[in-house]
Amino acid sequence: MTHVGFLPEIPTSTEYYSLITALRDLAEYIKGNGQYFLFETGQETPVTLKRVIEDVGTGNLGINLDPANLILYGMGNPIDALDVFGEYVRGVHAKDGFYPTDSKKLGKQVPLGEGKVNFPLFMKKLKEVGYTGVITIEREIRGEQQTKDILAAKKLLETLM
């Protein structure tokens, strides 16, 4: 699983073609080992991410859906994103946040249930698209508050499953 960086939005560009070629080489190599390559959501639109996966076309690419990253980067609503690329979701982060309000900064991560991700609807939508995998709680702070937030997130998620 990785953040590849910013994916080119224009599929006819030289940069896009070069990216697809490099990703295809990598994906074919790791496919020989029975491995998958997952893109973590964030810096690109859901449509661009789906296009890249389909254009590489090796069958072993997927998505780790971090709903907060889509919001933090201002790239879309994670529930709507599932309509676009739900079939490719192979992992999920439980993380919450707010859209950016300062054009020079990312949005703000907050404890699960306190941001813009509608987790009751998000969890329902995950089931609708057939996701049955792991949900990993992610809280990018340190110390005692991180532990408290993770335990609260676990409790919230248990009520939604």
Description of each model-found segment:
Residues D25-F37, F122-T132, L160:
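A structural motif corresponding to the C-terminal end of an alpha-helix
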Residues L19, F37, D66, V92, ...:
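Conserved, mostly hydrophobic/aromatic
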Residues M1-G62:
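Active-site acidic/histidine proton-transfer and metal-coordination neighborhood
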Residues Q146-M161:
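C-terminal helical cap(s) of enzyme catalytic domains, especially alpha/beta-barrels
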Residues I10-T12, G34, D66-P67, L106-Q109, ...:
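A short, structure-level motif marking secondary-structure boundaries and short turns
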Residues V4-G5, Q35, E40-E44, A68-L70, ...:
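Active-site beta-loop-alpha junctions enriched in small/polar residues
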Residues Y17-R24, E28, V47-K50, E54, ...:
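Amphipathic, non-transmembrane alpha-helical secondary structure
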Residues N69-T132, I141-E144, K148:
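Gly/Pro-rich active-site loop or hairpin
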